[in-house]
């Protein structure tokens, strides 16, 4: 949250062409955001909450210290039998249901959901969330690339009619601008629509990815990972940053920063020693752009995490993953990679 209101998109200014100092400050921010942290309580510059709903942010462009604006991560809580006000925005948003059961109304259509479903609020959607349980709350973790839409000027959002009747013609179908066939794709991804795979990355369940063309998600790639006690994930390197939500278990994230050596061409210099970031259930682990990293389960129970990336990195030429150390196969046949 900024001093003058909600920060939708953060600016970048410098008197120098090299931005090393900005990068140093960004990477100096803690890379684990503790459970219960509220960086934005949705009291300024928001429109969706009612007296039966609550929204709060863990990761956003207005955070101090600043980490990223490629992804925003927040929670939506609905009281028993409650709903929010509903609103419309141009950016997509993906809701992972942590608790409860309920339904959505998106553009007049109803979509039911329950725990462990992934709900996609598509581009240019007027939507509202409802809790069907009269006794228990519903809770969703929301991952969205809102600032990317803001950068592209896609800022038409809110509620109600905003055009001057005298100056504008009759309503026309906005969906004519969408990619053909998008409205036929899944809006709710259920566990039965996915499968667990043993891959180079470890035990993975992909929810959204460029290859999942049956799902109506265009900008956020999400997978779930299960790491056995005493084991670890893959050690790998990619350009996209990541937000990793710890659903259960505890452990630490090893992160090797990567510096650019810019001579005749770009070359990478990887830190000889990693930084170590411990985490517990409900924490959010942040992995900065261009970082080698690995998760280690040093607890006594399985580690379950939900990992999100902004797909834009893949679309602008950074769709490769460099594998430096495969995850242990734990006696299972490894079938390939299931990276989101």
Language model: regions and residue ranges:
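Catalytic cores of eukaryotic secretory-pathway lumenal/extracellular enzymes that build
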Residues: 113, 125-131, 140
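A short hydrophobic beta-strand segment most commonly corresponding to one strand
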Residues: 70, 94-96, 120, 135-154, ...
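Short acidic-glycine-tyrosine-enriched beta hairpin
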Residues: 108-124, 258-289
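A short, N-terminal "cap"/entry segment at the start of jelly-roll beta-barrel domains
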Residues: 1-69, 155-219, 234, 323-326, ...
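Asparagine-centered strand-capping/turn motif at beta-strand->loop junctions
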Residues: 130-132, 296-298
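His/acidic/aromatic-lined binding-pocket segments of jelly-roll/cupin-type domains
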Residues: 75-76, 86-88, 92-97, 111, ...
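Glycine- and acidic-residue-biased ligand/ion/polar-headgroup-sensing regions
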Residues: 79-80, 91-103, 107, 229, ...
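Conserved short histidine dyad/triad with adjacent acidic residue
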Residues: 55-62, 72-89, 221-239, 257-260, ...
């Amino acid at each position: 949250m900024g001093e003058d209101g909600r920060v939708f998109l953060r600016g970048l200014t410098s008197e120098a062409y090299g931005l090393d100092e900005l990068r140093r400050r960004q990477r100096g921010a803690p890379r684990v955001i503790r459970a219960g942290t509220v960086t934005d309580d949705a009291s300024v510059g928001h429109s969706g909450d009612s007296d039966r709903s609550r929204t709060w942010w863990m990761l956003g462009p207005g955070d101090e210290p600043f980490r990223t604006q490629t992804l925003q991560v927040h929670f939506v809580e609905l009281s028993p039998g409650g709903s929010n006000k509903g609103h419309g925005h141009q950016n997509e948003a993906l809701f992972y249901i942590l608790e409860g059961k309920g339904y959505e109304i998106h553009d007049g259509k109803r979509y039911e959901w329950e725990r462990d479903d992934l709900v996609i609020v598509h581009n240019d959607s007027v939507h509202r969330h409802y809790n069907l349980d009269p006794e228990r709350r519903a809770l969703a973790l929301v991952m969205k690339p809102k600032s990317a839409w803001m950068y592209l000027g896609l800022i038409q959002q809110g509620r109600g009619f905003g055009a001057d009747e005298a100056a504008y013609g009759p309503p026309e179908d906005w969906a004519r601008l969408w990619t053909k066939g998008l409205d036929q794709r899944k809006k709710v991804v259920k566990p039965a629509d996915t499968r667990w795979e043993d891959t180079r990355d470890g035990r993975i369940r992909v929810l959204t990815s460029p290859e999942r063309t049956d799902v109506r998600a265009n900008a956020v790639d999400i997978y779930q990972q299960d790491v056995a006690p005493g084991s670890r994930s893959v050690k790998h390197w990619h350009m996209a940053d990541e937000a990793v939500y710890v659903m259960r278990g505890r452990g630490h994230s090893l992160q090797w920063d990567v510096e650019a050596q810019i001579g005749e061409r770009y070359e990478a210099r990887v830190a000889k020693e990693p930084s170590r970031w411990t985490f517990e259930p409900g924490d959010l682990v942040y992995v900065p752009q261009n970082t080698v990293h690995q998760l280690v389960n040093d607890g006594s129970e399985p580690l379950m995490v939900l990992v999100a990336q902004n797909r834009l990195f893949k679309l602008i030429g950074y769709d490769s993953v460099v594998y430096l150390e495969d995850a242990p196969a734990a006696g299972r046949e490894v079938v390939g990679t299931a990276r989101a």
